């Protein structure tokens, strides 16, 4: 048996004269050939927010590589040991490297905290679903607190803030038209009533009403026009206030009261409304419009060329369309004859 193993032993011995050709550094110092399953390319960042390509499990490692402790990081060698698995593109190479590191947690001591680093770089909620990595344990308190405090918690908080802002913006414009209408009604009341009319402002702001006394005669002689106006308002969709068609008796009584007293108290207004079968709001608005007309007449007389108000101021009354020209001429003749 010794004769059988003699050539092999002779081959293992080092020749004495060849110290320069064979040395301990040349036998031990050279790194072992990299295994295809355990190769790690350290020239690029290990984890990037790309979805890694799933590879089949690597073949079992060689016993020499398993027994030998991991070497310190060295400059990256060329890539002849990985046939056809890596593309020349940068993104695929980094993704395959992260997959290999995740698939070999036992042979590398620094592999457990690396999925947390990958979660920090990756978009929240996509890394665990795509790769199927288990959630981190409770032991890594500092990493979890930093991750949840910096990455995940601001999203629901921001959603709540946006929802509250959107609700406030939606609810805001609903109250603005009411406030504008109230302010507009107050301004019109204040402009129609002078500062001496304290009684007519106690019922609250009333909507701006048309001047019934300007066309009261027309409405009373031509009632279908009011119905047509109401129908047109309903057709156009605008909620306009319907004009009040006063009768001749009501207009006569209102004119008498206005000549006696320009401003009414609450008691007088209620009494007139009850006597004429009108509402207090109708009486109030009629007096407001009549006062506005009276003030316009006074202002026109004051700014006339003569400088002094005329004794018989002209009050223009709108004439209905259906009245004939002959009636208008006869009316003018009667007015001219009545004047001295």
From Swiss-Prot:
Residues 239-298 bind DNA. It is found in: Nucleus. Residues 106-155, 167-242 are annotated as: Disordered. Residues 172-189 have a biased composition (Basic and acidic residues). Keywords: DNA-binding, Homeobox, Nucleus, Transcription, Transcription regulation. InterPro entries: GBX-1/2 (IPR042982), HD (IPR001356), HD_metazoa (IPR020479), Homeobox_CS (IPR017970), Homeodomain-like_sf (IPR009057). This is Homeobox protein GBX-2.
């Amino acid at each position: 048996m010794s004769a059988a193993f003699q050539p092999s032993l002779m081959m293992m011995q080092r020749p004495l004269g060849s110290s320069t050709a064979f040395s301990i550094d040349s036998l031990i110092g050279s790194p072992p050939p990299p295994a295809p399953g355990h190769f790690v390319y350290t020239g690029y960042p290990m984890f990037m927010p790309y979805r890694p390509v799933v590879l089949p499990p690597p073949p079992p490692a060689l016993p020499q590589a398993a027994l030998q402790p991991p070497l310190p990081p060295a400059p990256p060698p060329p890539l002849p040991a990985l046939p056809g698995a890596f593309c020349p593109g940068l993104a695929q190479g980094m993704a395959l490297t992260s997959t290999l590191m995740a698939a070999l947690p036992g042979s590398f001591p620094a592999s457990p905290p690396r999925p947390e680093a990958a979660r920090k770089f990756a978009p929240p909620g996509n890394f665990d679903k795509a790769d199927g990595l288990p959630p981190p344990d409770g032991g890594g308190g500092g990493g979890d607190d930093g991750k949840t405090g910096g990455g995940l918690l601001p999203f629901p908080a921001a959603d709540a803030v946006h929802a509250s802002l959107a609700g406030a913006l939606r609810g805001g414009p609903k109250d603005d038209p009411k406030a504008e209408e109230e302010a507009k009604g107050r301004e019109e009341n204040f402009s129609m009533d002078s500062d001496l009319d304290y009684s007519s402002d106690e019922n609250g702001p009333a909507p701006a009403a048309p001047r019934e006394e300007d066309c009261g005669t027309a409405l009373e002689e031509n009632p279908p026009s009011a119905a047509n106006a109401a129908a047109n308002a309903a057709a156009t969709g605008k909620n306009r206030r319907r004009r009040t068609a006063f009768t001749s008796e009501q207009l006569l009584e209102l004119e008498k009261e206005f000549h006696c007293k320009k401003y009414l108290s609450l008691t007088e207004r209620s009494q007139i409304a009850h006597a004429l079968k009108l509402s207090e709001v109708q009486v109030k608005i009629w007096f407001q419009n009549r006062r506005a007309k009276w003030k316009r007449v006074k202002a026109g007389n004051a700014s006339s060329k003569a400088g002094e108000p005329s004794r018989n101021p002209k009050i223009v009354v709108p004439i209905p369309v259906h009245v004939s020209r002959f009636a208008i001429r006869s009316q003018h003749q009667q007015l001219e004859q009545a004047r001295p």
